[in-house]
Amino acid sequence: RRRFIAGTAATAAAITAPYVSTSYAAGSLSLGMWDHWVPGGNKIFDQIAQEWAAKEKVDLTIDYLSTQGNKLLLTIAAEAQARAGHDVMDFSAWEPAQYSRQLEPVGDVMKEVLATNGPITEAMQYIGTYTGDWNVVPSTRGSLILPPCSRIDYFKQEAGIDLQAMFPAGKDPAPEAANWTWDTFLVAAEKCHKAGHSFGLPLGATTDSLDWVGSLFSAYGAALVDAKGNITVDTPEVRQVLDYSKRLYAFLPPDVASWDNASNNKWLVSGKGALIFNPPSAWVVAKRDAPDVAEKLWTHAMPKGPKGRFAPLLPRYQGLWNFSKNKSAAKSLLVHINKPDNIRKLVAGAAGYDIPPYQKLLDYKVWDDQGPPPGTLSHYPNRGDQRNVMPCSPAPPPIASQLYTNAIMPKMMVRI
């Protein structure tokens, strides 16, 4: 392994040179990765990582850890406490802030990645730089947003909205997309509800509930805690959201407060629902189990509020434990994984489920090629004026994670 001279020269070299010499065997490296649910999602990552390992003469092992039974979460906690285990781990949501003291700074990695891939979504940076420097590397693999997935026919017949004209396949949103606001959303919810096809919006203590509600709050500039940690519950913006949610709640299925993360998917796939907020997993299930429903689904942008159009983000990251014995090799691998060509392979291998955190890498054809109907996922990645947001931001991550874990926002909406 190449050893750099300490000081400024070392920093400059680290930015431009590989982290691992190809002249010598670089020991072993182990990864604990999220087990991708899309067939092929793990296979393509294996190919990319092992390609690097063969070139750099690294003995690389990859363990794919399921979220079922919290296996991945428990493994992270156990390794952090024992200060032993994998070198690199997969993290999600608020975990990089929770384990910041056990993570190796990776600002040198991110400097190289950003120089190649361009600016990163602010929502990813909000978590990844909580300590001041990057302590994790944002991941394309497993990162997703939860935009609307809607019935084309119900919207056209019952709400008078042509989603395919507003969000055409393979193109940016049409000018009339400016009219797709939360006010329009409320009117459409009422019309579809009266026609027997209510929007499937969960309001329980689940991630799906928190994610769409968080986007609603952001669209109105409402926050329960500000970036400095001050409580900001009693504001006109929060009151406006609560008033809106009271009106919306009347048009939802009566049991949404008890829904789990599968309930909204089932609602849509059953043919009962006109809209849910979800990544393409609901459409994939419909394509398998209810093809007559799948061919009528369209993924498109979030409604716009007074402060903008925000899509809920569920991010993933790779972090390097500060007790790793092969940090140089780990950093080299993280740079390799995040090269544009490899990001493109990851997105294609997951059939478009994964979303790159870099705006300049959102033009892949994989989303336009999905169907039926043709182009149904064209507007899954951000197009136009939509931005990603972490629910409960801009509160400092340790506070935001508690707001999120305790489902404060959806509970407020249910209880008013």
Pin down the residues of each PLM region.
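C-terminal capping/gating helix-and-loop segments adjacent to ligand/active sites or protein-protein/ligand interfaces
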Residues: 140, 374-416
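A ligand-binding cleft/hinge motif common to bilobed small-molecule-binding domains
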Residues: 95-99, 280-293
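Extracytoplasmic/periplasmic substrate-recognition and gating elements
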Residues: 26-27, 50, 54-55, 132, ...
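Short, solvent-exposed loop/beta-turn-alpha elements that line the ligand-binding surface or hinge
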Residues: 108-122, 163-178, 222-241, 288-292, ...
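Paired acidic/hydrophobic, glycine-rich loop segments that form the ligand-binding mouth/hinge
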Residues: 87-90, 274-278
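Conserved N-terminal structural module of periplasmic/extracytoplasmic solute-binding proteins
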Residues: 3-100, 111-121, 143-144, 156-167, ...
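Glycine-centered hinge/linker elements that transmit conformational signals in sensory
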Residues: 182-192, 227-258, 302
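Hinge/lid segment of periplasmic solute-binding proteins
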Residues: 92-147, 156, 183, 296-303, ...
